[in-house]
UniProtKB/Swiss-Prot annotation:
Gene that specifies this protein: YMD8
Species the sequence originates in: Saccharomyces cerevisiae (strain ATCC 204508 / S288c) (Baker's yeast)
Name of the featured protein: Putative nucleotide-sugar transporter YMD8
Topology in membrane: Multi-pass membrane protein
Localisation: Golgi apparatus membrane; Cytoplasmic vesicle, COPI-coated vesicle membrane
Cellular compartments per GO CC: cis-Golgi network; COPI-coated vesicle; COPI-coated vesicle membrane; endoplasmic reticulum-Golgi intermediate compartment; Golgi apparatus; Golgi membrane
């Protein structure tokens, strides 16, 4: 990937991710933000926007995607119940709890604690025998939770401060629950990949032809891969679309949206209160406390509700473009920098503060543990010799995704908290395409 293009995608990733985090905190913060009391309902609108955008994107940029939920003129309940529903419910819980937590915890604490999902990945990985127990991994989990405890620790004798601290602790548990669901979702995806090996017809055909999709050209000064037209044409004849996380988003978003909407109706009971909240009302008293609902305030409210959906969509495009061509270690390093920048911008823009030595120590411990985890994973990857997968050259060094032939084996994909969801959406789309091919062959 050209360096300028790579930096552009990284900037887009940083901007969308950091802006989205700050936006969500501002939207739900009851003290210094809009204080919207219906975070689960608001998240439902995000999913509706994602579904529409992903549908438009697939229509404009990709070949028609076969509906894996249709099987022999009927509904493919097996794929829906086994793959889509568990992933969608876990994702809805992850995102929903994250947004609810913004009512109680600052962005700085949220960002650092969210990194603890690595600990849940390791824990569940060992329980389900995806991970081989190693004392270094166990120590990493323990250190991670020690860091989380220090992040929320705030000694004080003031009653009001104790009440605030209780809310922060409650919000921190919500973030931990969100991280737990994130870890469970990752482990479940890996179990599905292990039990459903991905073998594409296109890959097999190219292999049988003893040809590569890309060839070397001695006259190519930049030593860039050149498309092997014969085998590329072979791929086109199959008429299959390339796996892409946007395909999965289009399938998951409606299920997540319905799950979140039902949860909101049962727990938040948002109607009719949402219409009198600050998101649909404007201050009309020139500095006073009077507000009213106008056409302008309604338009503003709708824009505020759908804007995060656009941010998540662009975020996914940038993440996937980086993952296609960038080694896992590089992605992890770039992701760690993004987390640090999120904390810094939270301090600058939202005027948040890490109060006291213990909070700073907790943040440093967690970030150091995340760095060590990624280094440990990198060393493991070198030993296990993961194969790369790339849309341009699958003979290059390790990239963010595994080769098709590795999926479903006893090896598992490297986990990165920064691009966790995009990785799993990509993997789930490969499972979907594999299931679709299998059902057509029956």
């Amino acid at each position: 990937m050209n360096r300028t293009v790579f930096l552009a995608f990284v900037f887009g990733w940083y901007f969308c991710s950091i802006a989205l985090s700050i936006y969500n905190r501002w939207m739900f913060d009851p003290k210094d933000g809009l204080g919207i009391g219906y975070p689960v309902l608001v998240t439902t609108f995000h999913q509706a926007t994602l579904w529409l955008l992903s549908g438009i994107y697939i229509k404009l940029r990709h070949k028609p995607v076969k509906n894996v939920l249709r099987k022999n003129n009927g509904f493919n309940w097996s794929f829906f119940l086994k793959f889509l529903l568990p992933t969608a419910v876990a994702s809805a819980g992850d995102i929903g709890l994250s947004n609810v937590s913004f009512q109680y915890v600052p962005l700085t604490i949220y960002t650092i604690i969210k990194s603890s999902s690595i600990a849940f990945v390791l824990l569940f990985g060992c329980i389900f025998k995806l991970e081989k127990f190693h004392w270094k991994l166990a120590l990493s989990v323990i250190i991670m939770f020690v860091g989380v405890a220090l992040m929320v620790f705030k000694p004080s004798d003031s009653t009001s401060t104790k009440n605030d601290q209780a809310l922060v602790i409650f919000g921190s548990f919500l973030v931990l629950a969100s991280s737990c669901l994130s870890g469970l979702r990752w482990v479940y995806t890996q179990l599905m990949l292990r039990n459903n090996p991905i073998q594409t017809n296109t890959a097999a055909a190219v292999e049988e032809s003893d040809g590569a999709l890309f060839t070397e050209n001695e006259d190519n000064v930049d030593n860039e891969p050149v498309v092997n037209l014969a085998n590329n044409k072979m791929l086109e004849n199959f008429g299959e679309s390339k796996p892409h996380p946007i395909h999965t988003i289009h399938q998951l978003a409606p299920i997540m949206g319905i799950t979140l909407l039902l949860t909101s109706l049962l727990v938040e009971k948002p109607f009719p209160g949402i219409f009198s909240s600050s998101i649909f009302r404007l201050d009309t008293s020139n500095g006073g406390v009077g507000t009213e609902t106008t056409v302008l305030s309604i338009v503003r409210g709708i824009v505020l509700l759908i804007l995060p959906g656009f941010a998540v969509f662009l975020l996914t495009i940038c993440e996937f473009s980086i993952l296609e061509q960038t080694p896992v270690l590089t992605v992890s390093i770039v992701g760690i920098v993004k987390e640090l920048l999120t904390v810094i911008f939270g301090i600058i823009i939202l005027s948040e503060r890490l109060s006291g030595f213990y909070n700073w120590l907790g943040m440093l411990i967690i970030m150091a543990d995340v760095c060590y985890y990624n280094y440990f994973r990198y060393k493991q990857d070198l030993l296990q010799k993961y194969h790369s997968v790339s849309t341009q050259d699958n003979r290059n060094e390790l990239k963010g995704f595994q080769d098709f032939e590795q999926l479903g084996s006893k090896k598992i994909a490297p986990y990165s908290i920064s691009v966790d969801l995009t990785n799993q959406e990509y993997e789930l789309d490969m499972i979907a395409q594999n299931v679709s091919r299998s059902s057509q062959q029956v």
